[in-house]
């Protein structure tokens, strides 16, 4: 009986190793970290130089929108509503692209998403401050496409442009590890908190760059997306 259990355990371990080897570049920690850096950069950018509106943290926008609505400040409420709508539209478009090009052989559909996101953010760098609402909507649209396209890291769900879900999942995994001492749970903790850390670093860099460089600072996020796209192109080859 003991020998049979050991045999089953070895087979399961081998299967896990094979699955890890087959993980796509889009689900690796390195690419996820690059996307998180870019996501943090975007949020800091729109908050600092685009009228204190969040491009990624739509919960904050909903809170501020609701507050202004209750105060009868409808113009200010719309200021926060439009990025939320743009975020929803981005998810819709990304889902359609994923469905249409999921089986494409020449290019991975996630590469298409990253390429579109890069173009949008590059254009945003040219939009003057008088059109901040349009700029923020475009960043929110691009961000949500990224959120929709990149939802897994080493097989488990995560978010590259926000922290609350990662914080919950990481802390849950920490609790499991403290109770059961499972190495896989500790690995999840490292991945989730690592993504939170890289998001924070990206936000810090984005904040400093937006303060000193201004509107064109968003090109730093575009550069990170180029790197992400190159990694996926290399895998495709």
Label for each model-derived stretch:
Residues 2-237:
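Alpha-helical transmembrane segments of multi-pass membrane proteins
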